[in-house]
Amino acid sequence: ISVDKTPIVDPDVGLNASIRIVNQQTVSKEKLLESGSATSEMLEFLTACIRYGVSVCIAGSTGSGKTTIMAWLLSQVPNNRRLITIEEGSREFDLVRRDENGRIANSVVHLLTRPHENPALNINQDFLLERVLRKHPDVIGVGEMRSAAESLAAAESSRTGHTVCTTIHSNSCASTYRRMMTLAKRKYMMSDEVLMQIMVEAYPIVVYTKQLEDRSRKIMEIIEGEGYEDGRLIYRSLYKYEVADNTIDENGEPHVVGRHRKGDD
């Protein structure tokens, strides 16, 4: 819940409140396919990435479906792998599985930040990331990268052999690496080239999600980052959603027509 009052808003307005409602229903592959968010091949590819040690960054704007895709992807981690999630503010992931007798069947730890005015008592995502590395995780889920410290800490976790899945606000797949770089640059005095190389190495796969005009949510593109040379990002588009037409029905409701295709189609 986010609330604003005067003097931020006009006195005659009173209070402005925004409530983020988390859907507690488990996201399934069938639901993602039914909604047209992705194809079966795309979801199987992302599952293989997480299961076999390839870190993934999911990008998009607010309400684009980043958290939904990430929650489903983390739910694909096998029961014998240790999964630790880090979230800021509120819990959105519930990935603990139980068997028919109610016993916990997988190895999952959910961690949450605890802001405090006293720096010694403040528990942020950067602090939790450092602690997580001592717990021998197979997969680390970072709710969202917002600061320089957690941006680089998450990247270094990936570069040291851990599988990381995280989200970030970005306008496209390709611009996601630069967004991560500019976040890290707020605190660390490294060149653009060094930071970009770190991010490309840390997150070989980037997924971009978007909410279209008809309010449907799609994975718009999946790319593989291959390198950064002479100020240019080198990448390969693996899957992409192409919009064929935008229509408006007799009730004034918009409809987007399109399809997912492989990068080499």
Question: Which role does the model predict for each range below?
Answer:
Residues 5-7, 19-21, 87, 113, ...:
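Flexible glycine-/small-residue-rich
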Residues 58-60:
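Hydrophobic anchor at the beta1->P-loop junction of P-loop NTPases
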Residues 63:
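Walker A (P-loop) phosphate-binding loop of P-loop NTPases
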Residues 66:
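Conserved lysine of the Walker
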Residues 1-52, 97:
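P-loop NTP-binding catalytic core
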Residues 54-56, 72-201, 210-211:
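Switch/coupling sub-region of P-loop NTPases
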Residues 200-265:
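Conserved P-loop NTPase
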